[in-house]
Amino acid sequence: INYIIRRWKILLLTLLIYLTSKTNTMRIQNALISVFHKDGLGPIVDALNAAGTNIYSTGGTQAFIEERGISVERVEDLTSYPSILGGRVKTLHPKVFGGILSRRENESDRAQMDEFDIPYFDLVIVDLYPFEATLASGA
């Protein structure tokens, strides 16, 4: 787990540098953020907000971001479906996966994205919840 945390922090620092770079040529229009471990996330959402990125999020991550005074699009509003199974199923929906897996250069994909009003996700930040601890708790 320490390796994963170190990699997470490296990713966050890299993304922060990218977002604040004057030579950034790709605008991140929509970001999906749903994480269990929120340490280090603050500067990233601040930078995304400053860059004008629409942030989509779930549950605790949404609350964390809103506590920073940043507007968040609720994934539940996007999907018109609630988080289920104790919060373990939140983003498993065609409107989420379509936004992640779509190919912008593909005319058919673009037509379906428009038809079903699916946002393109330019950035996805997720991590894993502590599965073993959750399992041991009986959840």
Short names for language-model regions:
Residues 14, 20-25:
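Ala/Thr-enriched low-complexity intrinsically disordered regions
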Residues 60-136:
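Glycine-rich nucleotide/cofactor/substrate-binding loop typically near the N-terminus or early
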Residues 25-78:
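N-terminal glycine-/serine-/threonine-rich phosphate-binding loop
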Residues 13, 28-30, 128:
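Short secondary-structure boundary segments
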